[in-house]
């Protein structure tokens, strides 16, 4: 009995506890990221933004949560009720499940699997199913058109993201996310006489791929200027037009969980994860989790600024950018990086 408890029960209890702790921290972080998104937009438009609920509006997201929860969910008359209610649950579950393999610091990961980046890519590809289910089950033309746009958009830009990840894997030599971060301890900066610095991170040596990944992440998460699935001027609110109350809140939660995931993934692949920008004692004293959060927040700030200042693309422009610009460019970069690594004897 003791061996059964120590072998199965205790490890399972630890994993459940870690998952719940990560979930609570992630939800609180998303609440404040949502507030930051609104504040950035307000600052660009010379407004104050949310500033009533709590000091400086810090509790605005929690007030919105209560508002959504206590509203009555309304299901359209011709909708498929089961699929209509299941769609937001699928979207938010898949968005949160991806975080199981994201390392926040050295050893701070629930499942440190050797194919972590492949798991993230596979699960994030499934998130479009929640949107398609919601658009189809609403029995309305605007949600259905928004769902079709979302499917085409996500498929188009996942190809470019896949090639970007391949170039990072060629440089890191591993599919494990922790190993990818640790591989950025040496690189271009080490050759220039600045070992373990921000010049070693992949953002510099793979700068074109960093730009492609950032723009593709905007399209993958339906962020402006690529928010075609929910374009207000054309599709009212896209696939969410028939949703309200808690289901709408769950769609929004899944969307922002995916956005924060892309920020974390950008940090891991290109910005050195939890590594400090310089190998000096003062910066090494700062816990790695702090560096990780600061870098992910910086990437989200770039997301927010892009949303506020860049106008929306037309649908044909979006598709042309993905298939005629990013796809050939990312494929060419894979070949170039592989050739350079082989030529330099690093492969």
From Swiss-Prot:
It catalyses: a quinone + NADH + 5 H(+)(in) = a quinol + NAD(+) + 4 H(+)(out). It is found in: Cell inner membrane. The keyword Cell membrane applies. One of its GO terms (biological process) is aerobic respiration. The chain crosses the membrane at residues 14-34, 82-102, 115-135, 161-181, 198-218, 258-278, 285-305, 321-341. InterPro entries: NADH_UbQ_OxRdtase_su1/FPO, NADH_UbQ_OxRdtase_su1_CS. The keyword Membrane applies. Keywords: Cell inner membrane, Cell membrane, Membrane, NAD, Quinone, Translocase, Transmembrane, Transmembrane helix, Ubiquinone. It comes from the Bacteria. GO terms for molecular function: NADH dehydrogenase activity; oxidoreductase activity, acting on NAD(P)H, quinone or similar compound as acceptor; quinone binding. It is a multi-pass membrane protein. One of its GO terms (cellular component) is plasma membrane. Its EC number is 7.1.1.-. NDH-1 is composed of 14 different subunits. Subunits NuoA, H, J, K, L, M, N constitute the membrane sector of the complex. NDH-1 shuttles electrons from NADH, via FMN and iron-sulfur (Fe-S) centers, to quinones in the respiratory chain. The immediate electron acceptor for the enzyme in this species is believed to be ubiquinone. Couples the redox reaction to proton translocation (for every two electrons transferred, four hydrogen ions are translocated across the cytoplasmic membrane), and thus conserves the redox energy in a proton gradient. This subunit may bind ubiquinone. PANTHER family: NADH DEHYDROGENASE SUBUNIT 1, NADH-UBIQUINONE OXIDOREDUCTASE CHAIN 1. Belongs to the complex I subunit 1 family. This is NADH-quinone oxidoreductase subunit H. The gene is nuoH.
């Amino acid at each position: 009995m003791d061996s059964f408890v120590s072998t199965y029960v205790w490890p399972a209890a630890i994993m459940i506890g870690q998952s719940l702790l990560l979930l609570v921290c992630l939800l609180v972080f998303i609440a404040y990221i949502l507030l930051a998104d609104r504040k950035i937009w307000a600052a660009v438009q010379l407004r104050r933004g949310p500033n009533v609920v709590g000091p400086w509006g810090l509790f605005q997201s929690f007030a919105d949560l209560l508002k959504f929860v206590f509203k009555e969910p309304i299901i359209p008359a011709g909708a498929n009720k089961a699929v209509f209610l299941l769609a937001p649950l699928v979207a938010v579950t898949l968005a949160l499940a991806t975080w199981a393999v994201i390392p926040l610091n050295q050893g701070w990961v629930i499942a440190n699997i050797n194919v972590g980046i492949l798991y993230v890519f596979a699960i994030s590809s499934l998130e479009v199913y929640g949107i398609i289910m919601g658009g189809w089950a609403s029995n309305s033309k605007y949600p259905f058109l928004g769902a079709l746009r979302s499917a085409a958009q996500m498929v188009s830009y996942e190809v470019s993201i896949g090639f970007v990840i391949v170039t990072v894997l060629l440089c890191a030599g591993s599919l494990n996310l922790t190993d990818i971060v640790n591989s950025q301890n040496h690189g271009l900066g080490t050759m220039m006489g600045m070992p373990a610095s921000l010049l070693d991170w992949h953002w510099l040596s793979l700068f074109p791929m960093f730009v492609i990944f950032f723009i593709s992440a905007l399209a993958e998460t339906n962020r402006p200027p690529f928010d075609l699935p929910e374009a207000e001027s054309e599709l009212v609110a896209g696939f969410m037009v028939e949703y309200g109350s808690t289901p709408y809140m769950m769609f929004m939660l899944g969307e922002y969980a995916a956005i924060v995931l892309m920020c974390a993934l950008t940090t891991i692949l290109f910005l050195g994860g939890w590594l400090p920008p310089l190998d000096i004692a003062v910066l090494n004293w700062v816990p790695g989790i702090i560096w990780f959060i600061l870098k992910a927040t910086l990437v989200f700030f770039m997301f927010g600024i892009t949303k506020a200042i860049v106008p929306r693309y037309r649908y044909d422009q979006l598709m042309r950018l993905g298939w005629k610009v990013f796809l050939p460019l990312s494929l060419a970069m894979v070949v170039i990086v592989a050739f350079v690594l082989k030529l330099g004897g690093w492969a």
